[in-house]
């Protein structure tokens, strides 16, 4: 099964854990014309009242400037890998086994299937792990 596998930049911003906290940040990107492929937000239990928002891609001068003005920063500690292709049963297991066999303990993963298409975003801890993940997943 052939997948398109690529590295992605991960941008993050702290948000208030309240209605509209994420919307405030995402609206700034939308106004600048961002076409985001990944958005993920979660509360931060260790910081009550706060959350973190992950988004990407952030590209183009206008979008980058808007992201920075809204408080986003490109993460140096989170490296992304995107996998996309045709959907088949068991892909999550195959992807996670390929990562395990490559010695990668990923820090986060999301996946979705829409119709016959599949896409997964994987977060790893280093550029080295991202390169290893891309190489391993291209072999699937």
Regions found by a protein language model. Name each.
Residues 1-140:
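A conserved regulatory-domain signal marking ACT and ACT-like small-molecule sensing domains
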């Amino acid at each position: 099964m052939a997948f398109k596998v690529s590295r992605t930049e991960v941008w993050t911003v702290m948000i208030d854990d309240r209605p509209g906290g994420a919307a405030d940040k995402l609206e700034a990107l939308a106004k600048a014309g961002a076409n985001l492929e990944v958005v993920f937000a979660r509360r931060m239990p260790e910081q009550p009242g706060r959350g973190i928002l992950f988004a990407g891609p952030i590209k183009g001068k206008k979008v980058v400037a808007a992201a920075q003005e809204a408080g986003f920063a490109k993460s140096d500690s989170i490296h992304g890998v995107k996998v996309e292709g045709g959907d088949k049963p068991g892909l999550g297991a195959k992807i996670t086994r390929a990562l395990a066999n490559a010695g990668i303990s990923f820090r986060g993963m999301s996946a979705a299937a829409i119709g016959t298409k599949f896409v997964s975003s994987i977060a790893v801890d280093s550029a080295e792990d991202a390169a290893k993940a891309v190489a391993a997943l291209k072999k699937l």
